[in-house]
Amino acid sequence: MADSLAPLLPTHIEEDEDTSSPLTFDKILEKSLSDFGFSQFLQIVLVGLALTFDSQQIFITVFTDAYPTWHCLDHTICNPATTDICKIPRSAWDWDGGFKGKSVISEFDLECSSSFLRSLPSSTFYVGSIVGGVVLAMIPDGSLGRKQLLFFSSFAMSLTGISIFLSSNIWIYSFLKFVIGFARSQTGTYALVLISERISTKWRPRATMVPFTLFVLGFMSLSGIAYLVRHASWKVLYLCTSIPAGIHSIFIYFFALESPRWLHLEGKNKEAIEVLKRISPANRGYLESVSSRLRPKETLEQTSSYSIKDLFIIKWAFRRVTLVMIIMFGLGMSYYGVPLAVRDIKVNIYMSEALNAMVELPTFVVTPILLEQFSRRSSVLVNCLIGGASGVLCFVMSLYGRTKIAFALELGSFFCARIGFNLMAIYLVELFPTCVRNSATMMLRQALVVGGACCPLIASLGRNVPSLSFAVFGFAMSGLGLFALLLPETKGLSLCDTMEEQEQRDQALKTSHSC
């Protein structure tokens, strides 16, 4: 307890000795948000709910684009166990329940189409996410602000999801999936950055787990919603997820607070202090007393402006973002690929997806423990090695017909992939300053999506060699996770706002380590 209070003591004394000197915004934020209040929690939940609806759009095709079950009508030429329905007359068989609109496959008559056409909606969704990641990353961090970007992203995603109800063929549906992918490509980025910039260093590991938990709850709720509407049209599932998402985006617009760090960086000190007052009403008096000691706007405007291109021009930034993207590519393959490949283990699809979602919940308890007890690098490295080994062993157990053990190992691999993503998301926030943090986080999620885009093709390998895709995902997670050894350690460090501050602190840390 004494150690946690020690850093505040000299700062307080220094402020008392010279109350006329400028005070850094980082010190003001850290002190005013040193306690975690109920208003902070409500703001985190409000923003974090965007990830709930985002996760539903990511995994919704598991149910809407599934191959429906069918039965024979003419048993003289049809056998459910051996017959290929593409080689017998349409009158000899029918979909279970006699309902053609249960799935995209049945409604658009894709049962005998190529695998490319059947997987086109999922593929265009990921392509849209990749294109959106590139295009939206070009928007400067200082243009609209964290809150406005999150609102536009969530609202566009929900509006397009509702429009899918009007799609009449696979091409229109695939185009709308592309638009959804484009719109939601940076939803997680905007939400994570907005939350992390409104919290102190002390509470960051725990607070940033809230939106991730809500992401998983979205995944879990999707399984429940899909089960409840399993006898209705697949389009109903889009309405059940998109309409609440649209309502939530309106709540974001009216009730979510902007990032105080971003406001300060834009020279809007008055607005930044007002946000801090609303987040932490108990420290209103302290904030009013120190607001006049912040650097004025004209001083802030003298600092250099940065954009995403600087992540590739500045040597240390390029090195970090490259390493992060390599690690996230491997984690993305496992995180998105394992739920797709689980059908090769021959378990109930509703049960398997629900269990995969439930397995994620403990990760939000484990992740803060790892962040508080161990270094960032070692946590990422060991987690990736364990997760990769689980994936490879899952493949081996499947070859020997040990279905239950293989499924348990699949859950273990998915568990580690989720922890890895949690760790890297917080790690990246600490690796880059406020002026490029949005852009850097976009690159992280871009690598995650590119890894996910490879999954449908890799998962299809399991149809020829049972569960081979698990071995591929396992080797990717372990092998690419080794690059964590090349990243600098950031445990216990506060966030920087400019590139200059980041460089000065990194240099100071190098000097202290060499002494």
Curated annotation (Swiss-Prot):
Q: In which tissues is it expressed?
A: Mostly expressed in leaves and siliques, and, to a lower extent, in roots, stems and flowers.
Query: Does the keyword Metal-binding feature in the UniProt annotation?
Result: no
Checking Pfam families in the record gives:
Sugar_tr
Provide the coiled-coil residue spans: none
In the bilayer, the protein is annotated as: Multi-pass membrane protein
Biological process terms in GO annotation: cellular response to cold; cellular response to salt stress; cellular response to water deprivation; monoatomic ion transport
Position of the signal peptide? none
Q: Which GO cellular component does the record give, naming just one? A: mitochondrion
Annotated GO molecular function terms are: ATP binding; transmembrane transporter activity
What are the TM regions of this chain, as residue ranges? 44-64, 125-145, 150-172, 178-195, 209-229, 236-256, 321-341, 351-371, 380-400, 412-432, 442-462, 468-488
The highest taxon in the source lineage is Eukaryota
Ranges per topology, Cytoplasmic: 1-43, 146-149, 196-208, 257-320, 372-379, 433-441, 489-515
Q: Which UniProt keywords apply?
A: ATP-binding, Ion transport, Membrane, Nucleotide-binding, Transmembrane, Transmembrane helix, Transport, Vacuole
Q: Which residues lie on this side of the membrane: Extracellular?
A: 65-124, 173-177, 230-235, 342-350, 401-411, 463-467
Write out the similarity annotation. Answer: Belongs to the major facilitator (TC 2.A.1) superfamily. Organic cation transporter (TC 2.A.1.19) family.
Could you identify this protein by its name? Organic cation/carnitine transporter 5
Q: Which organism is it from?
A: Arabidopsis thaliana
